[in-house]
């Protein structure tokens, strides 16, 4: 840090949740002097809700974050207590790893990582006010009279609760649920960013005063119970993966030894003997179900439920409803599954997945004790709802920046999303593009066909966000191209160009790409005939005999055939497991992959049609009023973005294209005349 100006940075990141940590780390890796500010350094990267990372779509995001040099996957690999591959019986597009992390250990390892990152400073402070960059006045002064003296022209300034002023050339806000947050359990309401932590009320009011339209959103969390009061004999056990599984690509492509777990002691004694897998100790999770008595207790107390009494004003996530909402909406369903998830190796706290609630605490005790395995359960923390401010739709651009103010970036729940993974992905891109802004370089914008991160951000800027947004595989129309197994092939080359990963890792990924392509060429070129000798060799490894001539690739297309079987039968080259996986997927799904790739090429032509930033959509003749208003509000940067806006039909797109072509011809004519 500059010793003459100790409080002046290239970039300031406000908030050290999952978005803020990734943003600060990325910018610092890219050479920017970065300051990460948080209300409580002991809660940095705190997992304030569930202890899980990953799952369908979310696991895809984590693999992409890792491929781009982010931290979430690496930290999870060192701190998980269990990991599984979900949707293993389905196709590769929807398979994804999901881990249960040790919540306190995750935060500890993340903090240690950030503390040792060059160019990055961590400070504990609550930000109460933001000063926007001011150009030099006519008399050379940089700031209005009521602002602190010494703020440099073109710099942001943030003022802390202790009146300390920090300055920077760009600013990233990752405020989570803290903006004017309030927590609710029954009739109890108190100001909080999350339980036990003060809200950022002054900052929320300051953003509103700066003219940012804000909406009120809501999320919830379930009770935490004491493992010592659970009858585990009446639960169904869910074990972790029996074979090595990680989020990180690094150990596969570099041949590194997988990361050592950060915890090496014994688990809390309340848990039954954990699975001692040969590759990594893991703790099981446990499944229980609600009962008719549970449902009756909830229904009997709906008049005390803030969700139905009008106390809660914010809109909650549709796909993560509270238990009282599920019982009302799905009245015909006799039971709901609840997963009991340990929050760490050395704690007795257990997270009740699927039981988000803001019912009064006495009701929470009663309903949980109606479940046989929980007859004597004791709550360690009651569930609660949290309401908070978020930006209204249309405030951010594709590079995560404000549409109003250059150099201001937003990431995480302030943009209307929910989930650790969604926040981390946005934070990574906000940090990258804030650094690019500081360096005077164009932004990095991932397309929908390049990454789930691209789908996420594109949805945020082209769709009306009326409730907290959660990522699903169904949101990605090119999901067969965006698998967890090829995230490094899609994104690590870009990460190397940005300085987020070292050359050794990029070269290793390129070797993986080249080896996969080479093996596919070998398979396509090797012709097999249905001779007795060939069929005998195939039969020896469990492959059905041939009835006609075909290539080795054709044999591998059979659903039940694996590359290792074929290698043994045909003396094919040996390869690493991840390369074999790539070869199998390319062989089995080649036709579908080619079809999706053709569709991508068609859509890319629409994305290539740029819309000038100053384009006046209100002046478009022949456009419906609804379309005109939608385009003017969202201000899409490309024809492709415009086509994805709700309420925009093909006729509207055709009118827009004609208008752009007309403007292009006019601008070209003006250039010719001015040149003459």
From Swiss-Prot:
Membrane spanning residue stretches: none
Location in or out of the cell: Cytoplasm
Keywords from the UniProt entry: Cytoplasm, FAD, Flavoprotein, NAD, tRNA processing
Cofactor(s), names only, from the UniProt record: FAD
SMART domains: GIDA_assoc_3
GO biological process: tRNA methylation; tRNA wobble uridine modification
Residues noted as binding FAD in the record, renumbered to the chain: 15-20
Signal peptide range: none
GO cellular component annotations of the record: cytosol
Gene Ontology terms, MF aspect: flavin adenine dinucleotide binding
Binding sites annotated in the UniProt record for NAD(+): 316-330
PANTHER family: GLUCOSE INHIBITED DIVISION PROTEIN A (PTHR11806), PROTEIN MTO1 HOMOLOG, MITOCHONDRIAL (PTHR11806:SF0)
Assembly and interaction partners: Homodimer. Heterotetramer of two MnmE and two MnmG subunits.
Function recorded in the entry: NAD-binding protein involved in the addition of a carboxymethylaminomethyl (cmnm) group at the wobble position (U34) of certain tRNAs, forming tRNA-cmnm(5)s(2)U34.
Family, per entry: Belongs to the MnmG family.
Protein name from the UniProt record: tRNA uridine 5-carboxymethylaminomethyl modification enzyme MnmG
């Amino acid at each position: 840090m500059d010793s003459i100006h100790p409080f002046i940075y290239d970039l300031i990141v406000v908030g050290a949740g999952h978005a803020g940590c990734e943003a600060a780390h990325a910018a610092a890796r890219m050479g920017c002097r970065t300051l990460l500010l948080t209300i409580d350094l002991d809660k940095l990267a705190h997992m304030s809700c569930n202890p899980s990372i990953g799952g369908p779509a979310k696991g895809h995001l984590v693999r992409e974050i890792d491929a781009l040099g982010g931290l979430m996957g690496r930290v999870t690999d060192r701190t998980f207590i269990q990991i599984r591959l979900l949707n293993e019986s389905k196709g590769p597009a929807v398979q994804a790893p999901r881990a249960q992390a040790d919540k306190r250990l995750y935060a500890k390892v993340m903090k240690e990582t950030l503390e040792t990152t060059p160019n990055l400073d961590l400070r504990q402070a609550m930000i109460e006010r933001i000063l926007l960059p001011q150009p030099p006045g006519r008399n050379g002064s940089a700031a209005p009279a009521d602002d602190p003296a010494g703020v440099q022209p073109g710099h942001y300034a943030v003022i802390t609760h202790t009146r300390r002023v920090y300055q920077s050339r760009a600013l990233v806000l990752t405020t989570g649920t803290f903006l004017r947050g309030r927590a609710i359990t029954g009739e109890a309401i108190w100001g909080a960013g999350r339980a036990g932590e003060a809200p950022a009320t002054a900052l929320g009011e300051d953003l509103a005063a700066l003219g940012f339209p804000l909406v009120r959103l809501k999320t919830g969390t379930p009770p935490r119970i004491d493992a010592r009061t659970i009858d585990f004999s009446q639960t169904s056990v869910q074990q972790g993966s029996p074979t090595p599984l990680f989020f990180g690509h690094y150990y596969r492509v570099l041949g590194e030894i997988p990361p050592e777990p950060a915890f090496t002691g014994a688990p809390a004694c309340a848990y039954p003997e954990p699975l001692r897998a040969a590759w990594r100790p893991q703790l099981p999770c446990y499944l229980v179900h609600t009962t008719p008595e549970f449902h009756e207790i909830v229904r009997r107390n709906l008049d005390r439920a803030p969700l139905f009494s009008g106390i809660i004003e914010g809109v909650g996530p549709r796909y993560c409803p509270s238990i009282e909402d599920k019982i009302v909406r799905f009245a015909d369903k006799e039971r709901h599954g609840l997963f009991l998830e340990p929050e760490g190796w050395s704690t007795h706290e257990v997270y009740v997945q699927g039981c988000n609630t803001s019912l009064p605490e006495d009701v929470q005790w009663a309903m949980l004790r109606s479940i046989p395995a929980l007859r004597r359960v004791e709550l360690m923390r009651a569930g609660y709802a949290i309401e908070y401010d978020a930006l209204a739709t249309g405030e951010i651009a594709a590079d995560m920046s404000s549409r109003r103010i250059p150099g201001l970036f937003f990431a995480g729940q302030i943009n209307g999303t929910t989930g650790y993974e969604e926040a981390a992905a946005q934070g990574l891109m906000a940090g990258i593009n804030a650094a690019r802004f500081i360096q005077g370089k164009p932004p990095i914008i991932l397309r929908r066909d390049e990454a789930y991160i691209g789908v996420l951000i594109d949805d945020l800027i082209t769709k009306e966000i009326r409730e907290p947004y959660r990522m699903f595989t169904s949101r990605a129309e090119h999901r067969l191209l965006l698998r967890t197994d090829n995230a490094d092939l899609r994104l690590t080359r870009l990460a190397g160009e940005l300085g987020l990963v070292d050359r050794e890792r990029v070269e290793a990924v390129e070797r993986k790409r080249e080896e996969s392509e080479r093996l596919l060429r070998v398979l396509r070129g090797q012709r097999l005939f249905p001779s007795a000798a060939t069929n005998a060799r195939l039969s020896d490894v469990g492959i059905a005999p041939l009835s006609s001539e075909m290539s080795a690739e054709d044999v591998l297309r059979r659903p039940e055939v694996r590359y290792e079987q074929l290698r043994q039968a045909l003396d094919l080259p040996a390869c690493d497991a991840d390369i074999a996986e790539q070869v199998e997927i390319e062989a089995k799904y080649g036709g579908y992959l080619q079809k999706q790739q053709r569709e991508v090429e068609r859509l890319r032509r629409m994305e290539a049609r740029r819309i000038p930033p100053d384009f006046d959509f209100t002046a478009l003749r022949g456009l419906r009023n609804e379309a005109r208003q939608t385009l003017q509000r969202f201000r899409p940067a490309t024809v492709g973005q415009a086509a994805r806006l709700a309420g925009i039909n093909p006729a509207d797109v055709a009118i827009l294209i004609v208008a752009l072509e007309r403007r292009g011809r006019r601008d070209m004519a003006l250039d010719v005349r001015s040149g003459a």
